[in-house]
Amino acid sequence: MSSFEYPQDLRYLDTHEYVRLDGEIATIGITEFAVDQLGDVVFLELPDIGDLLTKGDTFGSIESVKAVENLNAPITGTVVERNEILVESPEAVADDPYGEGWFLKVRVNDPDEVNDALTADEYRAEVEGE
């Protein structure tokens, strides 16, 4: 079995982004599984505060020594905060992807959109089958 964490309070995309909804603010990042697959992260491109994310669209990219991957929005809303620590030191995402390793905080347009994303159990089944 896998040693990856799948926090129950998150929703997941099959492209390995997660979203944590707290009222009308969503925190977005990538999963521990994604961090493991990427290896050493060397660059992170994130949108600016005030930018609009549209669910399903690309909002940035993450680059490792192995690959460059697009980041996909799990929810629609306006960026209200971005993790500047990760922009400066992207490798830090590996230390705590579900905590201090978040990418963006977004004021959501429709909180119910989060229900379209995978539950922790659905995501676990998806990645453990990969």
Swiss-Prot record:
User: Does the keyword section mention Glycoprotein?
Assistant: no
- Give a GO biological-process term: glycine decarboxylation via glycine cleavage system
Domain of life, source organism: Bacteria
**Which cofactors does it use?**
(R)-lipoate
| One Gene Ontology CC term in the entry | cytosol
Q: Which residues form the Lipoyl-binding domain?
A: 25-107
Q: What binding details are noted for the cofactor?
A: Binds 1 lipoyl cofactor covalently.
Keyword field: Lipoyl
Q: Which residues carry this modification: N6-lipoyllysine?
A: K66
The family classification in the record reads: Belongs to the GcvH family.
Q: Which HAMAP family match?
A: GcvH
Instruction: State the protein's purpose.
Output: The glycine cleavage system catalyzes the degradation of glycine. The H protein shuttles the methylamine group of glycine from the P protein to the T protein.
Q: State whether it acts alone or in a complex, and with which partners, per the record.
A: The glycine cleavage system is composed of four proteins: P, T, L and H.
**Protein name per the record:** Glycine cleavage system H protein
Organism of provenance: Nostoc sp. (strain PCC 7120 / SAG 25.82 / UTEX 2576)
Which gene is annotated as encoding this protein in its UniProt record?
A: gcvH
